[in-house]
Amino acid sequence: MSYEPPFKITSQIIDLISQISEAVGEINSLENNPRHLELRKENRIKTIHSSLAIENNSLSIEQITAIIEGKRVLGNPNEIQEVKNALQAYELLLTLNSYEEKDLLKAHKLMMNDLVERNGKYRNEGVGVFDGKQVVHLAPPADRVPFLMADLFQWLKNSDVHPLIKSCVFHYEFEFIHPFQDGNGRMGRLWQTVILKDWKSVFAWLPIETLIKENQEEYYKALNSSDSNADSTNFIVFMLQTILNTIKEILETEKKITPKINVKITANQKKILEAIKQNPFVTQEELSGIVGIAKLNINKNMKKLQENGIIERVGADKNGSWQIKTEE
């Protein structure tokens, strides 16, 4: 008989799937957003930062951005290596097949390059999850790992449950098996994303790990309670809620930014913005000379830029300066 991971599909889970499916439709519209490529880059950096921070990597998001941009960064060499490895693994994400065990091993080989001896190979020794000195989870024996992982991938291929549920169940079962010597947390989170992007490609760019990091204690509670119940239902609910919250947060952020980005800026307004960039203290009289239009028209254009949330006045009218909030 084939393996069936224990979990229940509750009314709460059905409701969350419905909400996520609707929200995914909304987020797909961001493909046409002028900020689309920038948003992808931002989210990839957030994903890598958060997934590694959960594993106690102390590098800041600014340091990680610098590493990704090829700049030199002062820091723990192992932590810097973790960032470089994670970037390589996530860059491979779109080519990974969620049903292929060999792809999981390929991703682990990259993720743990120069960090462990058995990168890309299942562990050959016992491992446990510790809270201080206390064992909170003792993983199955090493000689069982290849069979347990084969069963899990077989279930993933053959199950007809919704991909959102499958991704959560796989994530939980993967963490329970703890198939690798190290890197199990970041690989479990990566593989959930791989499963989800095979359902809807937009998931390749959603920083779900960021909200997991923000709710790290709840993440571990959901894993532990599912261990206690021998049933992953609690973990499924936690992860689905996290996925929904991630999408909602992105939509909310983009709704605030997009109207400003989509505002039509005239040629004269562009000249005004360039002048403000050069000198935030520039006066309307000076702008009149720079742009070549009457001071009255400068005033009208400045008001329009303020109304559209593109510039704001900082300080008093007489001695203050101009600040550009959002550019075209």
Show where each model-derived region lies:
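FIC/Doc superfamily catalytic core
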Residues: M1-E328
